[in-house]
Regions:
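N-terminal helix-turn-helix DNA-binding core of bacterial DNA-binding proteins
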Residues: 4-39
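Key DNA-contact positions within bacterial/archaeal DNA-binding proteins
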Residues: 42, 98
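Intrinsic disorder/low-complexity segments
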Residues: 220-248
Length: 248
């Protein structure tokens, strides 16, 4: 495999581990990576062996996958470039919001050590991506709330912190329904057996699948006590829902 192709593939694995762990609070194991990346478990196993050989990941006795210091550095660099590319696409090129993730994935590997700081300056030193994720190295703490809309009690008003960005169809649904970082939202009713949640987003009433709601991370409306969360673990709220959610 040519070195450039190999590096791109390695970076994709490293960033997937980084996002699952730091952005979504997942315990990262091989089967979840296969589901997330939509590739076969044997392919994941082969790449993990290569990443271990290169001292980029470690696998502990429970089969949990961890980034080494160098793996974390590599992943964080690619995440930073990806999110800067998203900002470029949406704020400068005016690309449709829901298309930015996929297009940024094509651009991120072309951003160099020379162009990255200039891009950061030209964009006005953004601190978050269009989808609400912190940009590493932008000067804000990388501490994210791990509670999703699916875990908020009915009638509790919260603010959307960030949304799952890796599904263009889902992002378009979010956009059309006003589900964006910073928007206020109140879950009004949960139909557990139907798997749906009805929420008020701004002035709109939106019905979505509970799996979709688990891909919307939220913050308390104002500083102070945490909102009344309904039993969903704040650190593991996204577990079991990685991959390609649907809005039904």
């Amino acid at each position: 495999m040519p070195k450039q192709v190999s590096n791109v593939a390695s970076d994709d694995y490293l960033t997937a581990i980084y996002r699952m762990n730091f952005d979504e609070g997942e315990d990262v194991i091989a089967v979840r990576m296969a589901d997330r990346l939509d590739i076969t478990p044997p392919s994941v196993a082969g790449m993990l062996k290569r990443l271990q050989r290169d001292s980029l990941v470690e696998i502990d006795s429970r089969k949990l996958i961890h980034l080494t210091a160098e793996g974390h550095r590599r992943a964080e660099q690619m995440v930073r470039r990806h999110r800067l590319a998203e900002c470029l696409l949406t704020s400068v090129l005016k690309l449709d919001w829901w298309k930015a993730y996929e297009e940024a994935h094509l651009l991120e590997h072309g951003i160099s050590d020379v162009t990255e700081p200039r891009l950061f300056e030209a964009l006005g030193k953004p601190t978050r991506s269009p989808f609400g994720y912190p940009i590493p190295g932008a000067g804000i703490p990388y501490v994210l709330p791990m509670t999703t809309l699916a875990g908020v009690a009915e009638g509790t008003k919260v603010i959307i912190d960030r949304v799952f960005e890796e599904d263009e169809e889902l992002l378009r649904f979010f956009y059309e329904e006003g589900i964006r970082p910073g928007a206020p939202v109140v879950p009004e009713a949960v139909a557990a057996y139907r798997g749906t949640l009805t929420a008020r987003v701004g002035e709109r009433t939106v019905v979505m699948g509970t799996q979709v709601a688990s891909h919307i991370w939220v913050n308390a409306l104002t500083p102070g006590p945490s909102p009344d969360f309904a039993g969903e673990g704040s650190r593991r709220s996204a577990r079991g829902s990685a991959g390609r959610p649907r809005n039904g």
